[in-house]
């Protein structure tokens, strides 16, 4: 009786309770993962494949090779998927850095996506994307022509053709082409309202930074100038990773003003604001 009431946790030699599942509808669940790709370019550098699959239809809603597998690049991959296929109800990912961070949580929360993480070191939980990874290794990576390894652009061009073909072939489990299965429920998709600008804003990163004594803040390792009046204060910023021209300071009223990277040479020749008054310590009492 005690053992029935207090089941023992699964040990290394015990199998986990895994049950096959499938989303009830298209965009009900997306699964995402990263796969090591080939070395490309000169000098050769490792490419990483980021991919997202729709659980119900098995359609690959986004796939691309990137030079760095990090939070910023995955946000870009997710943005591609949302722009072309709508907003999923859930996003199922692992615990790697690109998938477990505050910015992705904020983005998903703003879009109404439930962000779910698999148990640590339990890649098998994301069965559909893992099976697709195996298919891609056997059918795409193993037959990749040498010219496709000249750069990320060439590699992604080959990948796009292969993914388009994959989405048009009948899937072994559903007996239906992923693209066809997805299109059958196109009337149920939810897209971001407000067009491209609203989609862009939904993927803006948010941070709060303390303003240094030289009226700068640091974002992703780079300094940006802010108004002198904010020295010592906390500044809220919105920015698009990787785009220095898309960094904004949030005002007390919620308004946005663009800020620029610090130019130390320009600052050296800038006119200094004189104090409102001065004291001549050379005069006697």
Can you describe what each PLM-predicted range is?
Residues 33, 58, 78, 91-94, ...:
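Mobile genetic element proteins and their domesticated derivatives, centered on retroelements
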Residues 167-285:
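C-terminal, beta-rich DNA-binding module of retroviral/retroelements integrases
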Residues 105-200, 241:
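Charged alpha-helix within mobile-element recombinases
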Residues 45, 63-87:
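Active-site beta-loop-alpha junctions of metal-dependent nucleic acid enzymes
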Residues 54, 66-70, 264:
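A short acidic/small-residue loop/turn micro-motif
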Residues 41-48, 59:
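Short, flexible loop/turn motifs enriched in small residues
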Residues 84-102, 119-121:
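Acidic/histidine-rich, metal-coordinating catalytic segments
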Residues 1-38, 123:
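Basic, flexible linker segments flanking DNA-binding modules
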């Amino acid at each position: 009786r005690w053992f029935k009431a207090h089941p023992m946790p699964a040990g290394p030699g015990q199998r986990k309770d895994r049950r096959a599942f499938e989303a009830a509808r298209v965009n009900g669940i997306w699964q995402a993962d990263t796969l090591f790709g080939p070395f490309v370019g000169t000098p050769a550098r490792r490419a990483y494949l980021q991919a997202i699959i729709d659980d119900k239809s098995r359609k690959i809603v986004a796939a691309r090779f990137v030079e760095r597998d990090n939070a910023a690049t995955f946000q870009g991959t997710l943005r591609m998927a949302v722009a072309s296929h709508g907003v999923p109800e859930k996003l199922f990912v692992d615990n790697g850095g690109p998938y477990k961070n505050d910015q992705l949580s904020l983005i998903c929360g703003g879009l109404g996506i439930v962000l779910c993480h698999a148990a640590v070191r339990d890649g098998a939980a994301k069965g559909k994307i893992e099976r697709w990874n195996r298919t891609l290794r056997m059918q795409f990576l193993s037959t990749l022509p040498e010219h496709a390894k000249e750069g990320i652009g060439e590699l992604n061009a080959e990948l796009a053709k292969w993914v388009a073909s994959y989405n048009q072939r009948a899937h072994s489990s559903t007996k239906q082409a992923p693209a066809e299965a997805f299109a059958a429920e196109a009337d149920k998709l939810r897209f971001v309202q407000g067009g491209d600008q609203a989609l862009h804003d939904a993927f803006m990163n948010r941070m709060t930074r303390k303003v240094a004594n030289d009226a700068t803040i640091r974002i992703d390792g780079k300094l940006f100038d802010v108004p002198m009046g904010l020295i010592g204060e906390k500044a809220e910023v919105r920015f698009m990773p990787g785009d220095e021209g898309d960094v904004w300071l949030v005002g007390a009223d919620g308004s946005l003003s663009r800020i620029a990277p610090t130019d130390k040479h320009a600052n050296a020749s800038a006119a200094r604001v004189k104090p409102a008054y001065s004291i001549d310590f050379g005069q006697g009492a």
